């Protein structure tokens, strides 16, 4: 038997590259989570899940590791502190967390509490987010930046909060907003902190490139900035402008795109300072990417730079422009939400079943006993018996042609159902035999490089793709997916992952592999009476809030975990996933009304003796239990 080590598993899933030193594999072959990069302490994910199931917390389970979240905040602030020192930058850096990236109260609360030591702020983009931000700022003097479109009520809320002591900066996204702000400032007499968002010609790259450039949704063009300055000077409000903001998109994969935007943004800042605008902060927005596939490249699911390089370039480029222009360097703000929260949550769920052919009838005896096989079946049998590495290419092509021929003959009535089943069975055996030969050939013939897709099985996992990893479906985002156990054993199956929704789109067919994106995931054969769990990693950004309720599969169970040197871990919070009645409530159904309607109808049937009292009671008991139960599948 071929020797297999945990290092081999780490390699095929590329774990050491996307894991940011936060994930590893222990000697038992289980995935572990570390509280911070290079920490010796860890939590065994498989052992943790087993403990949670003993506590009656069923999969799918969203695991939120709060120490990882704190570690990411600390890392971002540390690299900027180092960059400031190395470049002798004369101003400060400040992190603002954009609530939209993950609005869960416990997440924002953890960021706000831990971030106090770094004077972390919150960025909001709507009235509900503003209210959430104010709730965390209360008693904490937490600074808030307000982006997004604003109506009168939004602006009045900011002005009123400013008046009673909240530290809020109101960013002007459009000129018509400024007119409204000036009107309300005159009406209330409140002097707000104002920011101006500029529309750079520089663009990002990838799915969110349209956040920058001349056609961007938000921001003022150069002519509009001049108009805004004139309007503010006219109303004696130019002194209120404290911040300049730009944003060229999320997940910027190329560092040169960031450098270009920094140069343009810093130059605009310098010119506005020369015009007498007393800007104190330059908010460079988001864009700091996450290396989802570990390739350290400029493809959509990766980045070609490190967090250290990002921070150094930000500080260097801004300082260089300011010194060249002879203006004071600004305090720098970044809104790096994705890089802050992506790593801290892991979804773990169980595999329910597979479409493996192991349960198919064994036609070996039938083939041996059959006096006469259908010609197509006989040809497939002959290929299986004679195939070797020298006839590999030809036999593979013949097999593909013959299986199509079998389907056509069956449809025309020339093959029986049993004939077609034997043809499919032989096709599977031929493909597996080809694979056993191909594995020993270097290099693999070009025509055979994609044939492994014929071997790909479907593993059905207990989750909703649309609820838990919607970006995988919506924008083909790659997320690392790894079995959390048996990684000291060689995987013997290549698979896709299908969810339990009634939608053919609910399947993942692109994965993080050793050499980048791959069309299959190496997994292990399912053992009888042994649970097999897979983990979805780096899903902390956007996935929870973007998830929808396809087939009414609701929120999953969520558990907040902190590390403990003595006990390994402590469960801080358990948030129960949606029960069936809660999912139904989202679409205007009411559990009591459903029960009453069914009960009334059953009583009529009992009275007419169509069913017994016992049958009625049993059904109502099942219905009540289902309404109160988890929307996902049990045993």
Swiss-Prot record:
It catalyses: L-arginine + H(+) = agmatine + CO2. One of its GO terms (biological process) is spermidine biosynthetic process. InterPro entries: Ala_racemase/Decarboxylase_C, Arg_decarb_HB, Arg_decarbox_C, Arg_decrbxlase, De-COase2_CS, De-COase2_N, De-COase2_pyr-phos_BS, Orn/DAP/Arg_de-COase. This is Biosynthetic arginine decarboxylase. It comes from Geotalea uraniireducens (strain Rf4) (Geobacter uraniireducens). It comes from the Bacteria. It holds the Pfam family Arg_decarbox_C. Gene3D superfamilies: 1.10.287.3440, 1.20.58.930, Alanine racemase, Lyase, Ornithine Decarboxylase, Chain A, domain 1. Its EC number is 4.1.1.19. Its cofactor is Mg(2+); pyridoxal 5'-phosphate. Pathway: Amine and polyamine biosynthesis; agmatine biosynthesis; agmatine from L-arginine: step 1/1. Catalyzes the biosynthesis of agmatine from arginine. Keywords: Decarboxylase, Lyase, Magnesium, Metal-binding, Polyamine biosynthesis, Pyridoxal phosphate, Spermidine biosynthesis.
